């Protein structure tokens, strides 16, 4: 019922590739059925570990944009990005990225900045350039925690105002500010128009 000429579907939340490929094929059938002349675009966010040739062929054929969650070089990424068995995931993510590149799929990177990696903005940035990523998003992680009778837990949306302590992995305001300033200084001198950072 919308009158806009273009509609963007953003597939996000949890791990999107846990859904079978048939789910997204059906979604596209429904998009085409109800498009009524509008342009339909799709983008999807994934941790990249489940990417296969089949997935990448689908994304390429249907012109999907793929966002990959990768927190920089291996030593940064593997600090917090573990699989369900608690094992590091960097190698699998890079295998997925290489498949996207092999099939010519348009992709970008989403990186979480935390207490462990926030002091190394240039290592982050140069890594993404080395792997051929032209579009980069950086997101600071700040999680509040609540005291609890059996320990501490992350605050829900309803009790955020009562939570005054931050989780240990949260990035501090000073770290985030320094991260952005250092990153901007290098980007503006060398890479404007070649590499794209969402915040700039």
What spans do the regions from the language model cover?
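Canonical radical SAM enzyme core domain
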Residues: 16-66, 70-76, 84-95, 99-100, ...
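Extended hydrophobic secondary-structure segments that form protein cores and membrane-embedded regions
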Residues: 8-14, 41-46, 197-199
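Radical SAM enzyme [4Fe-4S]-AdoMet core and its adjacent flexible, acidic
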Residues: 81-91, 98, 102-200
């Amino acid at each position: 019922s919308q009158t806009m000429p273009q509609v963007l579907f953003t597939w996000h939340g949890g791990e999107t590739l846990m859904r079978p490929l048939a789910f997204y094929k059906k979604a596209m059938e429904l998009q085409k059925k109800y498009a009524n002349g509008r342009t339909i675009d799709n983008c999807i966010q994934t941790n990249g570990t489940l990417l296969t040739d089949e997935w990448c062929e689908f994304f390429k054929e249907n012109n999907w944009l793929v966002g990959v969650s990768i927190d920089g070089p291996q030593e940064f990424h593997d600090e917090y990005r573990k699989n369900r068995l608690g094992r590091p995931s960097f190698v699998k993510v890079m295998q997925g990225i290489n498949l996207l590149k092999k099939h010519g799929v348009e992709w970008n990177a989403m990186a979480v900045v935390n207490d462990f990696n926030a002091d190394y903005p240039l290592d982050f940035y140069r890594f993404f350039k080395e792997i051929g990523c032209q579009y980069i998003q950086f997101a600071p992680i700040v999680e509040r925690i609540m005291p609890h009778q059996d320990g501490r837990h992350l605050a829900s949306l309803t009790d955020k105002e009562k939570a005054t302590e931050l989780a240990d992995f949260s990035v501090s305001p000073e770290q985030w500010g320094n991260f952005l300033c250092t990153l901007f200084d290098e980007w503006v001198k060398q890479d404007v128009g070649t590499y794209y950072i969402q915040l700039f």
